[in-house]
Curated annotation (Swiss-Prot):
Function: Mitochondrial RNA-binding protein that has a role in mitochondrial translation.
Gene Ontology biological-process entries: mitochondrial translation; regulation of translation
GO cellular component labels: mitochondrial inner membrane; mitochondrion; ribonucleoprotein complex; ribosome
Species whose genome carries this gene: Bos taurus
Gene3D superfamilies: Tetratricopeptide repeat domain
Gene giving rise to this polypeptide: PTCD3
Keyword set includes Phosphoprotein: no
Chain segment of the transit peptide: 1-37
Protein name (Swiss-Prot/TrEMBL): Small ribosomal subunit protein mS39
Keywords from the named record: Acetylation, Mitochondrion, Repeat, Ribonucleoprotein, Ribosomal protein, RNA-binding, rRNA-binding, Transit peptide, Translation regulation
A Pfam family recorded for this sequence: Rib_mS39_PPR
Length: 688
């Protein structure tokens, strides 16, 4: 089998260069030679066949179970409680978050507490010597960071390297050289490993956590077409390779260098963005007739793609040259090799599509099983824009047909990016069936572990639920709403707006008060766009009296959010639309006193009322036989010089019996209106 795989890999020099013309453009075309079947069970041809030659089944005397097998069996019998908060937030009921902001703060506080506990344990290890865990859990015990060997020796150097003391390790190495002591090649390589991994700087206590966060920011910046975010994310990575640093100095002082020494330097340079220096170091490695390992080749492929001022053809040819050198040096590629190539091809946009398909086919031809990160890179390459074009690729359907029903295990750091990118494509294509297929894959086996951290999980479910609101029947959408929110994720205000629009299409507006109640619970009390959407839907049409009363109560609650001012939140300014909608809802529910109070807010906040609102106020005044209220409506329209003022005045004189005082007031308003119109006409004639 190894010889067959090597023979297949030898075709890389030509297989990746020939354009595909007669084969399908999808990445999942199955090749018979790339299929592998397990031969663990022999099936007899028929019942009468001779079974003497069949394989004998051997029953093992003892079955070795995993230490957590019982826990796994118990966990498989328990399903998610849709009414409970996520497991990470199950603490004191008062502390359970109710919004995405609070959940993020909760997780940060929890991580801060863990770091504080580790600091105390490691600072005072003598008080934490009792080990009560069975089996032993190393991460719960103190870590000893203080060196025990005081004299200057190679053993002391090895101890400080193990403790990740960068500066102390370099100092002892220099002292050993000054004393004329020869440091072994193995120890020197270990020191190079330390320096190249941390970029010649002391690692912080939460180095791994910071690296994970910074890598996520850089990945999100690459996926978005935003140059500012790319520069910001790249700047935050901080550590860059500096010329003539400790690693280069120690490497130059080494009397003997092996392949490990060169490979460590190359990988350190690539990690800290010294791509040109890494390629030069590889040339030096070849000149010394040494061979690089597969991990070094993976780093060199990345460095080749990131070299500035080089065109696509040049970069791709250089990558192919590296692959040919792998064949010449008898270095077999691994999954990371192909994933690195696909990730680099994403930088080439449309030029990288055909090489990506060729790379994927070659990958499967030599028997390497793709991971979720492989499909993620292909999706990101073929669907780089949010809105689908007229000739969008259908490759996402081939991918889902290939992997539906499969259970994946972690193989690549980017595996947890797949579901986010796949659901983004489903949303852009407006394909609900495909979204269900992706969600079904997520719930297959332990694939849920690849949903990613909290921001990616929220992105995935927000896209999924928004697509449900757009394409699914309202009853099914509401079932998903109860199942996912808030037990799985906390909705953004736009998610709730999508749900409101789905309720509007299905004529289920009676649920709007409940949606507003949920919005307050999820921390969207001060979201003006959400409140305006709710008010608009309630005020757009006439409804039965019971529903109008519920809408008026909801409008009064929304009105209180504009009037109140929390200690942490400045009061929102009154939008004109919200004033109009709330006043209309009060009028239709028969809450006339509250509605007439809204007229004063128009003057107070200098907002112009709509003509429909003024007409409804006139209807309300007529229904209550109140000419005084009608006069107030005319005064309000006149104060804003609205064109409808003349029509309202005519309605006032025709529909109401006015007192002498009211007639005089109305005459004054008419005179002021005519004077203002004559002044405007004279100004217009002068301009002419």
């Amino acid at each position: 089998m190894a010889s067959v795989a090597s023979a297949r890999w030898l075709r890389v020099s030509c297989g990746l260069c020939v354009p595909l013309t007669a084969r399908r453009a999808g990445p999942c075309g199955r090749t018979p030679s790339s299929r592998f079947y397990s031969g663990s069970a022999a099936v007899p041809k028929d019942e009468g066949a001779d079974i003497a030659g069949t394989e004998e089944v051997v029953i093992p005397k003892k079955k070795t179970w995993d230490k957590v097998a019982v826990l796994q069996a118990l966990a498989s019998t328990v399903h998610r409680d849709t009414t409970a908060a996520p497991y990470a937030f199950q603490d004191d009921p008062y502390l359970i978050p109710t919004s995405s902001v609070e959940s993020h703060s909760f997780l940060l506080a929890k991580k801060s507490g863990e770091n504080a506990a580790k600091f105390i344990i490691n600072s005072y290890p003598k008080y934490f010597q009792k080990d009560i865990a069975e089996p032993h859990i190393p991460c719960l015990m103190p870590e000893y960071f203080e060196p025990q060997i005081e004299e200057i020796s190679e053993a002391a150097l090895q101890e400080r390297i193990k403790l990740k003391k960068v500066k102390a390790s370099v100092d002892i190495f220099d002292q050993l050289l000054q004393a004329g002591t020869t440091v072994s090649l193995e120890t020197t390589n270990s020191l190079l490993d330390l320096l190249c991994y941390y970029g010649n700087q002391e690692p912080s206590t939460n180095y791994n956590f910071q690296q994970h966060e910074q890598t996520e920011e850089l990945e999100e910046a690459e996926e978005g077409d935003n140059m500012k975010s790319k520069k910001k994310a790249g700047h935050q990575l901080g550590v860059t390779w500096r010329a003539r640093n400790h690693a280069e100095r120690i490497f130059a002082l080494m009397p003997e260098k092996n392949a490990h020494s060169y490979c460590t330097m190359i990988r350190g340079m690539v990690k800290h963005r010294a791509h040109t220096q890494a390629l030069s170091m590889y040339t030096e490695l070849l000149n010394n007739r040494l061979r690089a390992d597969v991990h070094t080749f993976n780093s060199l492929i990345e460095a080749t793609a990131l070299v500035v001022n080089a065109k696509f053809e040049e970069k791709w040819n250089n990558i192919l040259d590296l692959l040919k050198q792998m064949v010449a040096q008898n270095v077999k590629p691994n999954l990371q090799t192909f994933n690195t190539i696909l990730k680099c091809l994403r930088r080439f946009y449309a030029f990288g599509k055909l090489p990506a398909l060729q790379t994927f086919r070659e990958m499967k031809a030599i028997g390497i099983e793709p991971s979720l990160a492989t499909y993620h890179h292909i999706i990101q390459l073929f669907y780089q824009h949010e809105s689908p074009s007229k000739g969008s690729s259908l490759i996402i359907y081939d991918i889902m047909d290939e992997i539906t029903g499969k259970t994946f295990s972690p193989k690549d750091p980017d595996d947890d990016m797949f579901f986010q990118s796949a659901m983004r494509v489903c949303s852009s294509l407006r394909d609900l069936e495909l979204a269900y297929q992706v969600h079904g894959l997520l719930n297959t086996g332990d694939n849920r572990k690849f949903i990613g951290p909290d921001p990616r999980r929220n992105f995935y479910y927000s896209k999924f639920f928004s697509l449900l609101c757009l394409m699914e029947q309202i009853d099914v959408t509401l079932k998903w709403y109860k199942d996912l929110i808030p037990s799985v994720f906390f909705p953004h205000s736009q998610t709730l707006i999508d749900l409101l629009q789905a309720l509007d299409v299905a004529n289920r507006l009676e649920m709007i008060p409940q949606i507003w109640k949920d919005s307050k619970e999820y921390g969207h009390t001060f979201r003006s766009d959400l409140k305006e959407e709710i008010l608009m839907l309630m005020a757009r049409d006439q409804h039965p009296p019971e529903l109008q009363a519920a809408f008026a109560d909801c409008a009064a609650d929304i009105k209180s959010t504009y009037e109140s001012q929390d200690a942490r939140q400045t009061a929102s300014e009154w939008p004109a639309n919200s004033l109009n909608y709330i006043a209309i809802l009060f009028l239709r529910a028969g809450r006339t006193q509250e509605a007439w109070k809204m007229l004063g807010l128009f003057r107070k906040h200098n907002k112009i009322p709509r003509n429909e609102l003024l007409n409804e106020f006139m209807d309300s005044a007529k229904a209550s036989s109140s000419p005084a209220q009608a006069v107030e409506v005319v005064k309000l329209a006149n104060s804003f010089s609205l064109p409808i003022c003349e029509g309202l005045t005519q309605r006032l004189t025709a529909d109401f019996t006015l007192s002498q005082e009211q007639k005089e007031a109305l005459g004054d308003l008419t005179a002021l209106t005519s004077d203002s119109e004559s002044d405007s006409d004279s100004d217009t004639s002068k301009d002419k």
